[in-house]
Amino acid sequence: MAMPDAEVEVNGGVVVYEFVGPEDGEVVVLTPGGRFSKDYGGVHELAEALAAGGKRVLLWDRPNCGRSDVQLYGRSESHMRAETLGVMLEKLGIEKVVAAGGSGGARDMIVFTMMYPEKVTKLLTWCIVGGTFSTMSLAGVYVLPELRAVRAGGIEAVLSIPGAAGSWADLCEANPRNKERLLEVGAEEFERVMERWFDAYIPKANEAIPGVADWEFAQVQVPTLIVRGGAKDYDHPARTSREVLSLIEGARLIEPPWPEDAWEQRGLRRRSGEEVGFEFWVDGAPSFLAFIDEQSTGGAVA
């Protein structure tokens, strides 16, 4: 049911994507988290499950993920990716989508829905990052190592640092163009962008999720389903999912369709040396399909 990978140029960079599912199916953009590619564990499994329910799933390597070209612009990395997706859909001739994402992908899809409300029919999010601990943790994953490296040794130093959720070196290995693109950006501009993106990961009283002011959630006017964060999942707190629920009029919160400790168990397995991804996400497919297939007269979910 999967089609071969394809490429489209957006804002001077190549985006790698594929479709899974019937050509006449309702389009669902499925977006994972981290700097992980569309081929990361568990992503295709969920896509196939949604496709089995008649959906046409668009999987994409977001800029700075997988085999797509790196991009360094925008208010935050999520805003850059949201703009990329908006232009990409226009080039592909796709007018409306269900925006679905987990972890960092949830943030990307929330921002996309705010920036392109005319393109989104429904919003579906899970494993949402927020709160002081997880927001500051993201700074330590995505920008602080980069800032230290570029200030100490330029772009070449950035290419040598490891990444807990994917690294720039990984991106260059997956796509040789990326090393040249980073060198062309140069240390000064790279540092400037990292400083701007860093601001999103400074916890603020009026930001339930990193880099998005609470007042901006009023722009989300589509039926929205939120999966509650795990009780002990400090990276995707239950509190954050409830805060987002309170900010989107009419949104619905459901209990996790996977084990309560799925994220913690994933961490234990990774620390033991096992290669694991987002395999538990496929457990959400029945709930996700039921939500997507609900008839709506517009506006948010009652």
Language model features: what each stretch is:
Residues 110, 114-115, 121-151:
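Flexible "cap/lid" loop of the alpha/beta hydrolase fold
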Residues 101-105, 109:
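Gly/Ala-rich beta-loop-alpha elbow adjacent to hydrolase catalytic centers
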